[in-house]
């Protein structure tokens, strides 16, 4: 007691510690146990005295006093009466804070159904009763009666009766012989009478006996809910309420406004309606009113309670006085403004301020400039305490006055307080973790925050008016974390790709580029210098310039750490940069002895960081920055209009292209090509033209002009310097300034045929200007959409991956995934080395030539390993991956590999899921929103041939070729690949060559670099004859299956296959046959006839009775009809892949290996089946008629081959080829989108997300576990259930992984808190309550919501220590219990002391 008295002013009772949270349905007794009294009146407060009405919604007797320790009538005041209940007004004398905690209840005169269990789909009550929602609503809203007890009558149990039928039945069978009820009471009776065990047993039998496919699914759903009620201890009748809880009054306050009006929470209105209707109903029942009136009142009560719980879920939305919908209890939780997202996950922070940022070039990397005014305000409490400690002030009031007057001693103290106290700077939008970093404040005059220029790229900040917020970490722990983890000097590398993010940009790059230029014939060329002092002296004397070619001595250190000096051919400018380079054996002068573009500077910083560590790199970066700024200012680079050089050849090129387009027009008029092909070719020609103009311009700008007399090189073009160095501007922008603007897009996304020939220097014509406005406006609209979409993608990614935390060092998994270099059209897009860097080898990596082990199994692959892997010519490496990691909750460090932001193995407790989500989401705003509608030209035309990038010998895989009548080698195989090998047989490149291409090389040829391997027509796809013979037409009849179109303008005829889906006559299957001399169809060597089915739109390129050779085309399919599919690009594509949506024209993939057979057509679909070679069951596909199937009857396909082209659906890849192939597909497809924009993201981030998309397993055979066949269960639950089964020697379940989209996966996490705060709050909570779910609070989000330390980072260590401590406590208690059992209970003095 005595402690309680002392503790009044600081009642810090520790919150009860808990490890998990359970959610269930509240029973009527539970609601009554929470309540402090029943609310009988709808009144709130007395409007004269402002005191709460007794028994009303704010009643002080039920909820507690309004003022601390004072009863309502004022008889008892002050502390000494604590705990007394006043006999006059009935109010307990206690803290007014209890009005935030105490609940009341309303006793309902008639039970009502809880709307969440009724209307939240699937309706829980409906599922349990096996009734439709419509029937349920008819009973609940008093339209139909339901038979509860049929008695001896011929009515059935649970039969619905309308009013008339009910009266008729009463007349027929007598009122007492059966019971029928209406409303929630009826449903409650039925629910109460359910025997769940019997229903569950019956359902299991029914599922086992079901024959159709849909029935067991439906029954399984119902069985699941029955089992949920059995296991959770919820009773079905609790879904019908007899008492409504009333939340504490201070959570739905009534606030007096000036002018005698009140602002009130909507909940009070909703409660008032419930109470009014309930009281009216009670009165009507007492008065024995007619049935119909009571029924109406009950219905109104049901509606009032519905509105209170979830307004608008059923019927009209109930609005307040101002026509605004009232916010019900459900709305309080939902959405961005709901409790979860507004108050629990995102809170406003005190001790923070914001201001505009300006550049602070003289700051060190770890500093920021903080305005004195801001610092004084932010650090006030620290200043007060320091003033007090130093004796400047005796009270806080005095200290406040001193600070307000800004006395000199206050500034001195501010300096002390701020020393070594980091502050955090944040720039919105915070897209990744580098959006908040810690700095040491430096006090400055003025009102703007100064920011170090090198951290701008991390914040994505510029100084055109951006604002930033400052936050002060208060506790020692927070300061420690800010200094150790968040200091800008600790965040040199980008977490997404491990490259430096503290990279000079703009002026600094320009300055360093200018320094590192070397020119011919400058004064003093060829002089030798011993050290920097001599060079500076010569520069000042103007004996040499910064760009002179000189020979200078550079002093470095060798591997033993001894200094050495070496003479390099270099320039004074480069020596200046070299002077700043830290001395290290691995860092030679060659790092700086080159032209310093932005990329080279980045590589240089990377090298310094890798070899010399963090401290050296930070110092180096600061010095490089100073040097860059100084030299950019000294160089005085600017540009005028004459620097934009329009190439002389431009008009020749334009004329040439105009002639080409005229020719295409003519070809179209002659009927040689279709409208679509003409469009493709024209667009293509102009595209090439504008590229060539740009090339010419770049040539002219970059070429070095020399002074004819002295031979000295002239000043390099300034624009070229800016663009080439990477400081500002890109070739694409220069092309628009001085080349030609090129093709523009219509608002619909198609490309306009006539390009913009002018550039900005020449100026646009009116027509051109108008044409270019579409694109400009679309760009602006896109940007706005993009930001929102990108943010939403990031949110979904974070939500799906937030539980992926490093929880153990090594899971010991034997599995892994195979990595190869990614080669696209013969170009190496991502080398093998770059993909395996920083990952763990799953097997020994062996050098093929010598058999030496380069990297032993289980070792992380570092930079020096990568160099050896590159040299050794290894093609494939098996590495550990998070996809195959066997850790239960979270991921293990070995499978994850290197922490990219630190360059070291990843730490325990690192939240890799969130990092992955941020790395993928942050560049989202740079991706386009564009969906390309391309007739194939712009993407295909450049790929009408393939060249070799290497010298070597040609090997051809799957060589199936034929010589056509023109004598060319034509590719007849679908999967032919030309492999180029070295003399020693190492594969250099693999080039896939498409069907119908003409091969320019053959097996065993030697090939030079740049030599063509194959060519093909990019605009059409041929159908080739495989045998020599004579052409015959089948089912090709003029007018129905084929049209002979004569072009009006040219009079040339061509035959096009048309869709013969007419109701009349037999079904036609147009085809071309190849017959022998004997007039019979030739048999193909692989079985089947030489019959070529023709797809719609195919153009026939042969005449009947024409003689063909193998490899000749019988028809061609225009590419536009095969290719005008929208190529979804950019952000929508990434979202589509992560959401695992089926693409519109999904490819059809062979599920088994076997032989193709065509069956009877079905309506407008073609039937195709694959017969397996081993004689198993055939697999059948129905394919829409318009689709081109490039397989003939009798072709042999491998499992996983494409039958119909298109984008494959990820689910199919998973089902047919397995997890590793799926991951490879998703990683490649997503990377492709980012690569186009030049964004680098490490594969492991995408793998982390994919791992979380594969959390569920679908049960194939439940064995002897509790699962149902076809049920989706969590992977961990699946493993645990099988382990349990194995222990009990039962048959385990089998299943296969299921791919879920990120939204779906987030909603199905094991934590209902995390799911509810993401989306569809009502549905998630309803489901969790029915199942009586327990949230173990393992993820990040749940812990933020309940206000605990998150189990990642520092929190992970704390959690680990807590578990160890708990186990120790248990041990001590257990041993003590054991000892006490053997000893008589006599309390000795030692025990008492304890």
UniProtKB/Swiss-Prot annotation:
Its EC number is 2.7.7.6. It catalyses: RNA(n) + a ribonucleoside 5'-triphosphate = RNA(n+1) + diphosphate. The gene is rpoC. Mg(2+) binds at residues 462, 464, 466. It comes from Xanthobacter autotrophicus (strain ATCC BAA-1158 / Py2). The lineage of its organism: Bacteria, Pseudomonadati, Pseudomonadota, Alphaproteobacteria, Hyphomicrobiales. Belongs to the RNA polymerase beta' chain family. SUPFAM superfamilies: beta and beta-prime subunits of DNA dependent RNA-polymerase. It is an enzyme of class 2 (transferase). The RNAP catalytic core consists of 2 alpha, 1 beta, 1 beta' and 1 omega subunit. When a sigma factor is associated with the core the holoenzyme is formed, which can initiate transcription. One of its GO terms (biological process) is DNA-templated transcription. This is DNA-directed RNA polymerase subunit beta'.
């Amino acid at each position: 007691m005595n402690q309680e008295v002392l503790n009044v002013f600081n009642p810090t009772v520790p919150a009860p510690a808990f490890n998990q949270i359970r959610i269930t349905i509240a029973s009527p007794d539970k609601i009554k146990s929470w309540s402090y009294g029943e609310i009988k009146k709808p009144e709130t407060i007395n409007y004269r005295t402002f005191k709460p009405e007794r028994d009303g919604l704010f009643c002080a007797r039920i909820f507690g006093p309004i003022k601390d320790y004072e009863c309502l009538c004022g008889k008892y005041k002050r502390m000494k009466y604590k705990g007394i209940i006043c006999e006059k007004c009935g109010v307990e004398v206690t803290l007014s804070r209890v009005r935030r905690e105490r609940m009341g209840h309303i006793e309902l005169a008639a039970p009502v159904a809880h709307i969440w269990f009724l209307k939240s789909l699937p309706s829980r009550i409906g599922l349990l009763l096996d009734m439709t929602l419509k029937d349920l609503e008819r009973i609940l809203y008093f339209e139909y009666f339901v038979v509860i007890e049929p008695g001896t009558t011929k009515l059935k149990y649970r039969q619905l009766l309308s009013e008339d039928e009910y009266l008729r039945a009463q007349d027929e069978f007598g009122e007492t012989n059966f019971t029928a009820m209406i409303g929630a009471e009826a449903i409650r009776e039925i629910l109460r009478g359910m025997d769940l065990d019997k229903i569950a047993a019956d359902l299991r039998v029914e599922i086992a006996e079901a024959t159709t496919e849909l029935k067991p699914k439906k029954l399984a759903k119902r069985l699941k809910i029955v089992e949920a009620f059995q296991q959770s201890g919820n009773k079905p009748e609790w879904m019908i309420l007899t008492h409504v809880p009333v939340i504490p009054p201070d959570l739905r306050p009534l606030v007096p406004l000036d002018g005698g009006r009140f602002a009130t929470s909507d909940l009070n209105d909703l409660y008032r309606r419930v109470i009014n209707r309930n009281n009216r109903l009670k009165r009507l029942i007492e008065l024995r009113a007619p049935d119909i009136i009571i029924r109406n009142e009950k219905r109104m009560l049901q509606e009032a309670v519905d509105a209170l719980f979830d307004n608008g879920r059923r019927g009209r939305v109930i609005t307040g006085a101002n026509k605004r919908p009232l916010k019900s209890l459900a709305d309080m939780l939902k959405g961005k403004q709901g409790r979860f997202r507004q108050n629990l996950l995102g809170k406003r922070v005190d001790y923070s301020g914001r201001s505009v940022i300006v550049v602070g070039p003289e700051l060190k990397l770890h500093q920021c400039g903080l305005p004195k005014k801001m610092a004084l305000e932010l650090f006030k409490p620290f200043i007060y305490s320091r003033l007090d400690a130093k004796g400047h002030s005796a009270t806080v009031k005095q200290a406040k006055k001193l600070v307000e007057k800004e006395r000199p001693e206050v500034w001195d103290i501010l300096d002390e307080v701020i020393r070594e106290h980091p502050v955090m700077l944040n720039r919105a939008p915070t897209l990744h973790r580098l959006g908040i970093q810690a700095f040491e404040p430096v006090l400055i005059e003025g009102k703007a925050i100064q920011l170090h220029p090198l951290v701008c790229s991390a914040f994505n900040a510029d100084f055109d008016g951006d604002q930033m917020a400052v936050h002060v970490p208060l506790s020692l722990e927070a300061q420690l974390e800010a200094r150790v983890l968040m200091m800008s000097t600790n965040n040199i590398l980008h977490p997404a790709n491990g490259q430096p993010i503290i990279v000079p940009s703009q002026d600094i790059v320009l300055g360093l580029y200018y320094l590192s230029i070397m020119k011919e014939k400058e004064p003093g060329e060829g002089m030798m210098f011993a050290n920097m002092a001599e060079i500076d002296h010569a520069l000042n004397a103007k004996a040499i310039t910064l760009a002179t070619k000189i020979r200078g001595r550079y002093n470095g250190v060798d591997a033993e750490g001894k200094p050495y000096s070496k003479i390099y051919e270099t320039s004074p400018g480069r020596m200046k940069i070299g002077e700043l380079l830290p001395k290290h054996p691995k860092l030679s002068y060659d790092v700086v002895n080159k032209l310093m573009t932005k990329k080279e500077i980045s590589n240089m910083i990377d090298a310094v960081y890798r070899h010399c560590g963090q401290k050296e790199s930070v110092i180096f970066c600061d010095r490089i920055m100073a040097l860059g700024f100084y030299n950019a200012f000294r160089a005085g680079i600017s540009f005028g209009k004459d620097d934009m050089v329009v190439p002389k050849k431009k008009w020749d090129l334009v004329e040439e292209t105009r002639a080409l387009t005229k020719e295409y027009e003519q070809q179209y008029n002659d009927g040689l090509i279709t409208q679509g092909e003409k469009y493709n070719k024209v667009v293509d020609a102009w595209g090439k033209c504008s590229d060539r103009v740009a090339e010419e311009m770049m040539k002219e700008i970059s070429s070095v002009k020399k002074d004819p007399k002295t031979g000295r090189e002239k000043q390099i073009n300034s624009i070229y310097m800016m663009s080439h160095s990477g400081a500002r501007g890109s070739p694409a922008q220069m092309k628009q300034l001085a080349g030609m603007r090129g093709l523009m897009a219509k608002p619909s996304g198609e490309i306009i045929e006539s390009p913009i020939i002018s550039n900005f220097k020449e100026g646009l014509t009116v027509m051109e200007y108008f044409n270019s406005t579409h694109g400009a406006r679309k760009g602006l609209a896109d940007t706005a959409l993009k930001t929102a979409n990108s943010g939403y993608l990031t949110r979904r990614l974070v939500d799906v991956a937030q539980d992926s935390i490093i929880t153990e060092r090594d899971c010991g998994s034997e599995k892994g995934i195979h990595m190869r270099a990614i080669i696209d059209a013969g170009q190496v897009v991502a080398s093998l080395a770059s993909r395996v860097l920083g990952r763990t080898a799953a097997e020994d990596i062996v050098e093929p030539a010598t058999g030496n082990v380069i990297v032993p199994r289980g070792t992380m692959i570092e930079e020096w390993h990568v160099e050896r892997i590159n040299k050794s010519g290894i093609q494939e490496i098996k590495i550990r991956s998070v996809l195959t990691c066997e850790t239960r909750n979270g991921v293990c460090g070995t499978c994850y590999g290197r922490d990219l932001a630190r360059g070291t193995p990843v730490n325990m407790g690192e939240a890799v899921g969130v990092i992955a989500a941020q790395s993928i989401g942050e560049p989202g705003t740079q991706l386009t929103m564009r969906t390309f509608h391309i007739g194939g030209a712009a993407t295909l035309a450049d790929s009408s041939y393939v060249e070799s990038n290497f010298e070597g010998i040609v090997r051809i895989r799957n060589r199936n070729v034929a010589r056509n009548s023109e004598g060319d080698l034509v590719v007849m195989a679908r999967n032919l690949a030309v492999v180029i090998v070295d003399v020693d047989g190492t594969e250099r490149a693999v080039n896939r060559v498409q069907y119908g291409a003409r091969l320019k090389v053959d097996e065993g040829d030697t090939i030079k670099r740049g030599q063509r391997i194959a060519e093909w027509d990019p605009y059409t796809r041929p159908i080739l004859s495989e045998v020599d013979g004579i052409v015959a037409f089948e089912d090709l009849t003029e007018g129905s299956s084929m049209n002979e179109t004569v072009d009006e303008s040219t009079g040339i005829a061509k035959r096009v296959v048309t869709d013969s889906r007419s109701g009349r006559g037999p079904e036609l299957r147009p085809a071309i046959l190849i017959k022998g001399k004997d007039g019979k169809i030739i048999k193909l060597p692989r079985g089947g006839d030489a019959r070529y089915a023709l797809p719609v739109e195919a153009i026939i390129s042969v005449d009947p009775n024409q003689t063909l050779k193998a490899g000749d085309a019988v028809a061609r399919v225009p590419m536009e009809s095969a290719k005008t599919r929208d190529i979804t690009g950019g952000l929508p594509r990434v979202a589509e892949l992560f959401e695992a949506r089926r693409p519109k024209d999904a490819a059809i993939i062979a599920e088994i290996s076997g032989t193709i057979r065509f069956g009877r057509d079905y309506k407008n679909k073609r039937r195709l089946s694959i017969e397996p070679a081993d004689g198993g069951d055939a697999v059948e596909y129905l394919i829409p008629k318009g689709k081109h199937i490039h397989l003939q009857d009798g072709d042999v396909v491998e499992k996983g081959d494409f039958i119909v082209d298109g984008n494959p659906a990820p689910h199919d890849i998973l089902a047919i080829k397995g997890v590793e192939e799926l991951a490879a597909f998703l990683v490649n497809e997503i990377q492709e989108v980012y690569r186009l924009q030049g964004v680098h993201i490490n594969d492991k981030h995408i793998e982390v997300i994919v791992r979380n998309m594969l959390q569920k397993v679908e049960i194939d055979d439940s064995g002897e576990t509790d699962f149902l066949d076809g049920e989706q269960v969590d992977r961990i639950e699946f493993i645990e259930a099988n382990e349990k089964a194995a222990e009990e020697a039962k048959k385990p379940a089998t299943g296969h992984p299921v791919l879920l989209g990120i939204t779906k996966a987030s909603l199905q996490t094991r934590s209902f808190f995390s799911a509810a705060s993401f989306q569809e709050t009502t549905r998630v909570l309803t489901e969790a309550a029915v199942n009586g779910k327990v949230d173990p609070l393992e993820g990040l989000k749940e812990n933020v919501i309940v206000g605990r330390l998150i189990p990642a980072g520092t929190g992970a260590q704390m959690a680990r220590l807590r578990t160890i401590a708990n186990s120790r406590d248990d041990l001590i208690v257990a041993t003590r219990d054991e000892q006490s059992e053997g000893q008589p209970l006599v309390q000795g003095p030692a025990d008492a002391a304890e």
